[in-house]
């Protein structure tokens, strides 16, 4: 029994391990991977490995895994990656898993600076990536520092601005909050819709030379072949759509492209190594097939996948609406509960206020009663004193009468009697004056007693009003309410140095509609506004001395009003012959 081969396949978010037989083909391994992760849009993807010479290579599906130039290691390492890119992610990507894999791969390309991304776009994309991971921003769930372990923006962008890590996180948190209500899957798609407008998105670059020996870049992507000057990967100079190409072939390092326009000469360039020409041919065949397929009616399989995706999306929207409804209901109940608690606290405060007022009124009443009793005691004492003085006056009158009678009856010493009489007369006058004063005091005390009695009656009436007022209402009781791209090469022999592929363009509709496209920022006012705001914010912290060569090129393109699609229209102008002549002259 042959010993199985241990294989480790790393996707963008998982590691898968398999044991395969020595006769297992690339397709069998590939099918096992896509089945495991539930992927049906298999035509975009491939298995990549580093060959014995250290070059990244795509696993051939029609050959045995063990017969290819994989390193003899245990386990054998593969990466599951997107090999071909869609023209428009929002129109072509069907499954959520497909969107997620593209999102993670493109994000990694931007963060590692393999795909140039300007600063303001990098921050906006970072906020969408945060939304895709964390969902809606919440002050309770997302405390300060919740982004501290996240890779958010390219290191190049951070180095170019005088902002701390915390300041970058604060900016992204603000934009994260702006995306409230957006589903995680939708955030990934919004990320890709913006990222696909970046100049280097989805392009495979290869070093080539024209017949003059000029060093150039060949860019192979979903739309065709583009030629770049050696010092500028952002701005293609010449473009050939796939619909203009009928045959691609190479012999050793010489690569020949035959246009559909038979009046045009062959498009010839040279690659430094044979294996590069093989990769170019494979990518050309795969991209051309997908380009043609997109311009034909969908197959039954794709129609079924789209119908299923629509149904799943509709179901998710319903679930989202139900969750939102339930969330709003819970929030309403919480608000109602908080309102009742506030009302209860207000009632308790009012009751305490009533109690304090009642106690104060009772104390005032008690004080007034005490004061009234004191006044009554003083009035009684004054009354008794007045009565005593009256008795003394009466006794004095009687004594006077007695003396007068004695004076009449007895004849004694006239002077002595007169002196006694004068003495008693003076005493009577004094007593009379004292009696009048006491009577006046009695009247005053009686007046004050009446006032106290009136205050007492008034206080009793106020207390009675407080005690008989209806109590505040009690707080209410709370009731908690597939198919693969045909990209393998038909070889004449194992050591053959020449390969050729015919590219058919029959039966396609609107073969160059991509030239009518505009960027997401141009058609989406919200994205346009966000990018403008971010650009203004970051310009104040930018260190102009740290601008890279790509920054300078990008800014110059912006200044001249160019973007990815305007450039595409420009580089395809003229007939095929004119553009080939232009390439030869570079």
Curated annotation (Swiss-Prot):
Entry GO MF terms: actin filament binding; cell adhesion molecule binding
Post-translational modification as stated in the protein's UniProt record: Phosphorylated by tyrosine-protein kinases. Phosphorylation by ROCK2 suppresses the head-to-tail association of the N-terminal and C-terminal halves resulting in an opened conformation which is capable of actin and membrane-binding.
InterPro entries in the record: Band_41_domain, ERM, ERM_C_dom, ERM_FERM_C, ERM_helical, Ez/rad/moesin-like, FERM/acyl-CoA-bd_prot_sf, FERM_2
Modified residues (N6-acetyllysine): 60
Modified positions (Phosphoserine) in chain numbering: 366, 535
Cross-referenced SUPFAM superfamilies: Moesin tail domain, PH domain-like, Second domain of FERM, Ubiquitin-like
Chain spans, region Disordered: 305-340
Membrane association type: Peripheral membrane protein
Domain FERM residue range list: 2-295
Region of interest (Interaction with SCYL3), residue spans: 244-586
Keyword list, A-Z: Acetylation, Cell membrane, Cell projection, Cell shape, Coiled coil, Cytoplasm, Cytoskeleton, Membrane, Phosphoprotein, S-nitrosylation
SMART domains in UniProt: B41 (SM00295), FERM_C (SM01196)
Regulation: A head-to-tail association, of the N-terminal and C-terminal halves results in a closed conformation (inactive form) which is incapable of actin or membrane-binding.
Motif [IL]-x-C-x-x-[DE] motif, residue numbers: 115-120
Residues carrying Phosphotyrosine: 146, 354, 478
BP-aspect Gene Ontology terms: actin filament bundle assembly; regulation of cell shape
Coiled coil: 302-462
Chain intervals with Basic and acidic residues compositional bias: 308-340
GO cellular component, one term: basolateral plasma membrane
Phosphothreonine, modified sites: 567
Subunit-level organization: Interacts with PALS1. Found in a complex with EZR, PODXL and NHERF2. Interacts with MCC, PLEKHG6, PODXL, SCYL3/PACE1, NHERF1, NHERF2 and TMEM8B. Interacts (when phosphorylated) with FES/FPS. Interacts with dimeric S100P, the interaction may be activating through unmasking of F-actin binding sites. Identified in complexes that contain VIM, EZR, AHNAK, BFSP1, BFSP2, ANK2, PLEC, PRX and spectrin. Detected in a complex composed of at least EZR, AHNAK, PPL and PRX. Interacts with PDPN (via cytoplasmic domain); activates RHOA and promotes epithelial-mesenchymal transition.
Domain remarks: Has three main structural domains: an N-terminal FERM domain, a central alpha-helical domain and a C-terminal actin-binding domain.
Name of the featured protein: Ezrin
Gene name of the encoded protein: EZR
């Amino acid at each position: 029994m042959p010993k199985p081969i241990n294989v480790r396949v790393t996707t963008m978010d998982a590691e898968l391990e398999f044991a395969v037989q020595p006769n297992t083909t690339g397709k069998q391994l590939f099918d096992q991977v896509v089945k495991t992760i539930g992927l049906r849009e298999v035509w975009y993807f491939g298995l990549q490995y580093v060959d014995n010479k250290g070059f990244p290579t795509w696993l051939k599906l029609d050959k045995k895994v063990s017969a290819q130039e994989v390193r003899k290691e245990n386990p054998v390492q593969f990466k599951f990656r997107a090999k071909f890119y869609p023209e428009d992610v929002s129109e072509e990507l069907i499954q959520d898993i497909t969107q997620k894999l593209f999102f993670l791969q493109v994000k990694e390309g931007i963060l590692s600076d393999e795909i140039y991304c300007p600063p303001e776009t990098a921050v906006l994309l970072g906020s969408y990536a945060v939304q895709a991971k964390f969902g809606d921003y919440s002050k309770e769930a997302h405390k300060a520092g919740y982004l501290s372990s996240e890779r958010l923006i390219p290191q190049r962008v951070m180095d170019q601005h005088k902002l701390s890590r915390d300041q970058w996180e604060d900016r992204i948190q603000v934009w994260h909050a702006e995306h409230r209500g957006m589903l995680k899957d939708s955030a990934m798609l919004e990320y890709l819709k913006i990222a696909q407008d970046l100049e280097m998105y989805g392009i495979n670059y290869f070093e080539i030379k024209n017949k003059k020996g000029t060093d150039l870049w060949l860019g192979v992507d979903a739309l065709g072949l583009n030629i770049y000057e050696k010092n500028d990967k952002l701005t293609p100079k010449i473009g050939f759509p796939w619909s203009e190409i009928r045959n691609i072939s190479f012999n050793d390092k010489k690569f020949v492209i035959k246009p559909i326009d038979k009046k045009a000469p062959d498009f010839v360039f040279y690659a430094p190594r044979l294996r590069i020409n093989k990769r170019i041919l494979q990518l050309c065949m795969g991209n051309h097939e997908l380009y043609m397929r997109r311009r034909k009616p969908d197959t039954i399989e794709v129609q079924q996948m789209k119908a299923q995706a629509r149904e799943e999306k509709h179901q998710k929207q319903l679930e989202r609406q139900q969750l939102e409804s339930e969330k709003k209901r819970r929030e309403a109940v919480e608000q109602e509960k908080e309102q009742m608690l506030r009302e209860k606290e207000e009632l308790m405060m009012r009751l305490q206020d009533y109690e304090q007022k009642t106690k104060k009124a009772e104390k005032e009443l008690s004080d007034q009663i005490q004061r009234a009793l004191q006044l009554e005691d003083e009035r009684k004492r004054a009354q008794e004193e007045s009565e005593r003085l009256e008795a003394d006056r009466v006794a004095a009158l009687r004594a006077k009468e007695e003396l007068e009678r004695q004076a009449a009856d007895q004849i004694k010493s006239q002077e002595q009697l007169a002196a006694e009489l004068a003495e008693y007369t003076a005493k009577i006058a004094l007593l009379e004056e004292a009696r009048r004063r006491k009577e006046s005091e009695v009247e005053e005390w009686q007046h004050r007693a009446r006032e106290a009695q009136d205050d007492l009656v008034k206080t009793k009436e106020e207390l009675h009003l407080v005690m008989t007022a209806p109590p505040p209402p009690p707080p209410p009781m709370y009731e908690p309410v597939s198919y693969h791209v045909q990209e393998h090469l038909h070889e004449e022999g194992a050591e053959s140095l020449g390969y050729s592929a015919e590219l058919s363009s029959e039966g396609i509709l609107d073969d160059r509609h991509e030239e009518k496209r505009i960027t997401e920022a141009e058609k989406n006012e919200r994205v346009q506004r966000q990018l403008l705001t971010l650009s203004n914010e970051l310009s104040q912290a930018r260190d102009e001395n740290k601008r890279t060569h790509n920054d300078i090129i990008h800014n110059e393109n912006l200044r001249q009003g160019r973007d990815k699609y305007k450039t595409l229209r420009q580089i395809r102008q003229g007939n095929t012959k004119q553009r080939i002549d232009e390439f030869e002259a570079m």
